[in-house]
């Protein structure tokens, strides 16, 4: 009998910069890989070309204080979603690194950002990971940069 365990985990670095480019806040946070996210990985490995689900392409931020759960399928209070600025696959460490930036007026009002997720569509879609964190107060002129690492081990 084969007995191999494949675990997925993730962590992200969030940096908030003011309109002047000065660093206002920086955090390192862990996340939950969702059940739908794990199913997405399995489908990417085993589906025929026409049925392969879309690649992860978006990151979203929101304002809910609801803790993450593997059964989550969306952010609870999404405020903005942006296309990933980069996706890097590391051959040596079984990691994928996703990056996104939420610039001025993204979202278009000041918010206390408390949650984030990675998705494979610009609306709805499969959520690979979700995290909740203490509030990061993003003003309309601020830029929020998120670098999210997901590892299979």
Model-inferred region functions:
Residues 1-114, 121-153:
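Small cysteine-rich, disulfide-bonded extracellular modules of the LU/uPAR three-finger superfamily
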């Amino acid at each position: 009998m084969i007995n191999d365990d494949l675990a997925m985990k993730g962590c992200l670095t969030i940096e908030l910069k003011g309109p002047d480019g000065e660093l206002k806040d920086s955090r390192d946070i862990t996340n939950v890989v969702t059940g739908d996210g794990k199913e997405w990985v399995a489908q990417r490995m085993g589906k025929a070309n026409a049925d392969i689900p879309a690649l992860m392409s978006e990151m979203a931020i929101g304002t809910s204080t609801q803790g993450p759960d593997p059964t989550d399928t969306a952010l609870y209070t999404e405020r903005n979603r942006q296309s990933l600025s980069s996706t890097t696959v590391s051959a040596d460490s079984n990691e994928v690194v996703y990056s996104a930036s939420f610039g001025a007026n993204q979202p278009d009002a000041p918010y206390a950002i408390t949650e984030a997720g990675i998705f494979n569509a610009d609306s709805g879609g499969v959520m690979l990971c979700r995290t909740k964190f203490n509030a990061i107060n993003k003003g309309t002129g601020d830029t929020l940069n998120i670098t999210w690492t997901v590892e299979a081990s």
